[in-house]
Each structure stands twice: as C-alpha cells, then as structure tokens.
C-alpha cells in the first residue's frame, strides 16, 4: 500500500493537492499522512475528514492527521513513517526579510530521515519552487519584470534556494530524492475548478516550443500537476519540472501585487533603511505632482 506525506495542507497549494487525492477516485489503496499546524482549520476546509471512512471498497484514501510544526524533526519522524513521497507545500504569504521557513523545514526533514531505522525505504520530496528560479523558464519573462519580481520576493527565493541546496546534498548522501515544481504566477487561491495544465520538460534543450510557459496558473491545476509529478517521480528525480496552463485562468493580480509591494518595501527597508525609503517615496510623489501640475499649466 503506497503512503504519501503532505506538509502544509491548509495552504492554497497543499489543499489543492489534498483535494485531488481525496476526490480523484484513483487513490483507494493510498494512505496520506497530513501535517498541519491547526487540525481544526483543516477540518473546517475538509469536513469529510472528520467522518468515518465509508467502506473498505471506497475510492477515498486513508487520511491520518498530524498536528505540529514542520520544522520539528520529532514530528516529522512520525509523519514520514512508511511514506515513500512527500508533498512539500509549506510556505507563507509574502516574502518577509529573514524568512527561513522552507529551509528549516527541509533541514528538519533531512534530520528526521537520518533518525529513521535502517534500512530506510526510498523517499522522494516534491518541492514547490518557482519558475523564476528555473533558468529555462525565467528567461521567457522580460528581464526588467524578472528583476523586479526577484527583488520584491528576494527573501522567499533565497529561502527556497537554500532548501534546494540541502536537498541536493541529501540526495548525494543517499537520504532522499527530490523533484522541483516550477509554476508561473499562481492565481485563484480559493478556486477548486481545474481548467487544464501541461508539464514542461526543462531538460530537453531542443524542444523550445513545448517549453513555453503561460504567465498564469491556478492553484487547482497546480495541485493536480503535483499529483501527476508524484506518480512519475522515478523518471523526474533531480529535475525542475515546469507547469503551464492549457485553459483559462481566473486571474487575481491584485493579491499578487499586494505581496510584491509588501516584499519590495521590506527589501528596500532592509537595504537602505526605512527613513531613506520614506524620503525617496516623498521625493517621487513631489516629482510626479510637479510634472502633473506643469502639464495642466
């Protein structure tokens, strides 16, 4: 009987993964160990998890809920018990300077693997990353836009990079395998309707046409894509796999703009100091005001 672990199941990505595992109808013999910080929040989003499993012949997988911190190796030892694959969907909104959540979770997971009794079964980590960190996909975005996004989300991207370095070292050590999932901008966090997606092989340098990535993808389609990647993990080990939409996406740019603005201001504050940032902002506003006044005059 296959067994998965899912970290971060109450977030937009984790909940879309869990929703597909629960309702796709192809997971009857699957056990999923779900780690969340708040069990009550998970049950509010998925009330059916609080009810007895219908029957032995049900197509719904067996769900085991663990409550705790994803950076605690003791908790992860229990969550990883018998698991052959981990969906790493731990994340936080925005990009606060100094964030280390993803790399700390990776370090705790690797420590938990070291503590597991020998012989260990093989474990594959499906780590959500970003197209901005995949050279093949990032080059498709205008350079100025890419640089602005990387500046605004610098802290979150640095956290992801460090986590990936830890996974690479752990794979070399033989503790685990990993696959990196690189979506474009993600939209419609509360949506559940899928409209279609396609995986992108970023290792085939001759197939440029099929490496093209749309700029938007829904969380719902990302969840299904991550489940497909899980089913094909053996052929994708060590790769960065792109995901692109093939259908319409309900776009929520206002939410993303808020995250970019918050991250950008935080990065400016960190590099130049809040007072200097405020002075610069006032100067820009005065300059714009002067230009508008001169145009009207």
UniProtKB/Swiss-Prot annotation:
Pathway: Mycotoxin biosynthesis; sterigmatocystin biosynthesis. Its EC number is 1.-.-.-. Its main location: membrane. It is found in: Membrane. GO terms for cellular component: membrane. GO terms for biological process: sterigmatocystin biosynthetic process. It is an enzyme of class 1 (oxidoreductase). Keywords: Membrane, Oxidoreductase, Transmembrane, Transmembrane helix. It is a single-pass membrane protein. Disulfide bonds: none annotated. Averufin oxidase; part of the gene cluster that mediates the biosynthesis of sterigmatocystin (ST), a polyketide-derived furanocoumarin which is part of the most toxic and carcinogenic compounds among the known mycotoxins. The first step in the biosynthesis of sterigmatocystin is the production of hexanoate by the fatty acid synthase (FAS) units stcJ and stcK. The polyketide backbone is assembled by the non-reducing polyketide synthase stcA by condensation of the starter hexanoyl-CoA and 7 malonyl-CoA extender units followed by cyclization and release of norsolorinic acid. Belongs to the avfA family. This is Averufin oxidase stcO. The lineage of its organism: Eukaryota, Fungi, Dikarya, Ascomycota, Pezizomycotina. The gene is stcO.
